[in-house]
Amino acid sequence: MQVRNILVALVVVCFAVSEAATQAPTSPPDSSASAEQVAQLLNAPSELDRLKLLKDNQFVFDFKNSKLGVTQSAGGKTVATSRTDFPAVIGHNIAMTVGFIEACGINLPHTHPRATEINFIAKGRFQAGFFLENQATFIGHILEEGMATVFPQGAIHFEINLECEPAMFVAAFNNEDPGVQTTASSFFGLPADVAAVSLNISSIQTVEDLAKYLPHNPAIAMKECMQRCGMTGSSESSESSEDSSCSD
């Protein structure tokens, strides 16, 4: 009788597994939080109180399928967590961005004003580098799959996919609100006369014209890479979906 019961139980389990396998894949969990919940989490008197404010699904963020925190253009997309998109990070001084970069794509030069970054190459091969401050020298690397590098807080840095197929990096931060400032677009966001003086250009119109040609992030990188990979078309990027998001 005991053997029979075990066999019946196995049949039931196998049937349940089979049924689950045939069901449509579930949609990514909605981990987002309202401004009110974020404020409550920030002001929680203890970690236990903060834990009670979160739902189970708010501890999971689906980088692959998320529609939150996405910046997308011709060179791929970056998906970044934030307090409102992934409230489980609140109080832990951590954040993350995953870059899904197309062949010859570049995550344009940018800074994180409030965080140091450690960047891990999950797939592919990247050229990466940073410039920290005046009188420093540029530091650059070729990073293979499985390697990592550090970008100090506030340093201008970038990542270029050197391969002819999509690649991926994972960037972690020591601040749940690292911020991001894309270098070129921020510079040309200054008053045109200030930008003109900085570039030693006399014509404000020239500065305004240059600003019109700035690519959106992530962009398609060097022509050499495009030629090597047999890619055709302009390296100019199309409009990004969310320029202000916290891309790496």
From Swiss-Prot:
Residue span, Cupin type-1 domain: 61-207
Principal location listed in the UniProt entry: secreted
A Pfam family recorded for this sequence: Cupin_1
Glycosylation (residues): N200
Compartment(s) where it occurs, according to its Swiss-Prot or TrEMBL record: Secreted, Cell wall
Residues annotated for Mn(2+) binding in this entry: H110, H112, E117, H157
GO cellular component, one term: extracellular region
SMART domains named among the record's database cross-references: Cupin_1
Keywords: Cell wall, Glycoprotein, Manganese, Metal-binding, Secreted, Signal
Record's signal peptide: 1-20
The keyword Secreted appears for this protein: yes
CDD domains, A to Z: cupin_OxOx
PROSITE patterns named among the record's database cross-references: GERMIN
GO molecular function annotation: manganese ion binding
Additional facts recorded: Spherulin is a major encystment-specific protein.
Alphabetical list of PANTHER family matching this protein: GERMIN-LIKE PROTEIN SUBFAMILY 3 MEMBER 3
Similarity-based family: Belongs to the germin family.
Protein's recorded name: Spherulin-1B
